[in-house]
Curated annotation (Swiss-Prot):
This is 2-succinyl-5-enolpyruvyl-6-hydroxy-3-cyclohexene-1-carboxylate synthase. The keyword Manganese applies. It comes from Shewanella sp. (strain MR-4). Its cofactor is Mg(2+); Mn(2+); thiamine diphosphate. Binds 1 thiamine pyrophosphate per subunit. It catalyses: isochorismate + 2-oxoglutarate + H(+) = 5-enolpyruvoyl-6-hydroxy-2-succinyl-cyclohex-3-ene-1-carboxylate + CO2. Keywords: Magnesium, Manganese, Menaquinone biosynthesis, Metal-binding, Thiamine pyrophosphate, Transferase. Pathway: Quinol/quinone metabolism; 1,4-dihydroxy-2-naphthoate biosynthesis; 1,4-dihydroxy-2-naphthoate from chorismate: step 2/7; Quinol/quinone metabolism; menaquinone biosynthesis.
Amino acid sequence: MRTENTATLNLMWGALILEELARLGVQHVCMAPGSRSTPLTLAAAQQTKLKRHLHFDERGLGFMALGLAKASCAPVAIITTSGTAVANLYPAIVEAWLTHVPLIVLSGDRPPELLGCGANQAIVQPAIFANYAQQVNLPTPDAHIAPQMLLTTLDEAVANQTRPVHINCMYREPLYPSEMSGTILDSESPYLRPLQTWLQHARPYTQYGKSEQLSSPSDDAIMRFVHGKGVIIAGTLTPEQDPQQLIALSQKIGWPLLTDAQSQLRQHPAAIGNIDQLLQHPKARNLLQEADRVLVFGGRLLSKRLIAYLAEQNWHSYWQVLPQQDRLDPSHNAKHIWHANAAQFAQLNWYRSSSANWANTLVTYNDELHSLFVRNIDQGEFGEAQVIRAIANTRPLEQQLFIGNSLPVRLYDMYAPVSCCTATTYTNRGASGIDGLLATACGIAAHQGKPTSLIIGDLSQLHDLNSFAIARSLTSPLVIIILNNDGGNIFNLLPVPNEELRSDYYRLSHGLEFGYAAAMFNLPYNQVDNLADFQSCYHEALDYQGASVIEVSVSQHQASEQIAALNLWVKQS
């Protein structure tokens, strides 16, 4: 009788956790199979408020949860069993912490008496994520512990949280109830008697007010700030921050808007998108050096040239706008940081600058680069930059674009074309790893089923082959474009002492193709080596209701040689 009560109480705690998380805004739960997490798994299986996603590999599962949280702007729960299953979430948790994405890890664990004694699949799980998650350690379920304690613990940890939380859940055996019938949270249960009111509504047990403390400058401070030559820089911004408001701000003040690949504005016709290249254009750089005021929205800039410009310029006034308290400036410039939403800050009572339109010539230089890229990329030899520009120019309404790390995101930042219709853009640029990129894109695609394109390098895809299994489950378009240049060819751009060292220790050529991997997971596959075939396959893939793979075969040195040639032309402009 006692063991059956243990199984029932375990399950009841699991159900209380999942129900309260749903009330706290969780929409998705990502689950990997395992025995010690059974109370959570069975509770999730009966929870109708959550959409369930299952995958056998915890590393990919964590990144899928990351993508779901990015796309939904809501916390996502992850259920794993004990042991190294939890450790496999670490890369995704690091990325989520650095980019303020709320993931909630629910890890099944052995009870205290089975830790540190050689029991199977038992490791020290509390604080396993070190500095990258808020830690909550729940005791083993006990009838003497009031259910209200469990709910208030969850509420305090999760409400208004913008970063990962690790909730470690210890369970004693038996884990499996003898039967699953009826509702787990039965209002007739004596244990749940203190929660009768809670059971009758759909609100969290404890309701926390929003803890936002937004800051903004006075009208007088704004007037002084805009009195001079300035630039506005759009760094990493999420779609819900409504970055379009920065266009109106730029036009009102009369300062140029310089845009990063992650700003949602990189291709906007009213922005200066080619800033990375303009900073090596002699006339443009000389003009930009006249600026003495800068207004930066967001951080984590891609362009090293833009980062260097911010570091080297002698700024009279440097303002940065961030949604949370953060330090996002590797150059450590003296500045005033305002905690605010980008759109709200852009809609303050701004005045026209006394030096409005001081940098209008940048538009001419930006247009010159556009023409240069059309001639030498779009009409040039087939390669990675040409494919990326073709993707950026071919977008259905409401498309989502996930750009992989290493070379793809840099090529987009350097050479993306101007377009009046741009996709919602996502990246993983917190830790900037090349792992979990396909899984993240699958999570983004799965949330609302919008057509999604992933641009990913060959080594990144080799890192995440398991996630083809997640892609296979999608029922909306996900086009996986693999830029296969046979290794880590971003190292062609770095000052490795000689070619032999570059080849043997950095580039790691593999000679592999992805056709059989796609076939293993029953994914439609095409391999292309020219622009016409790519465009035909890409349009077809966008109409396919599921995931498909396009492998783009390019030579090892094509991208680096093209970048070098373009750099030379820009410098000679």
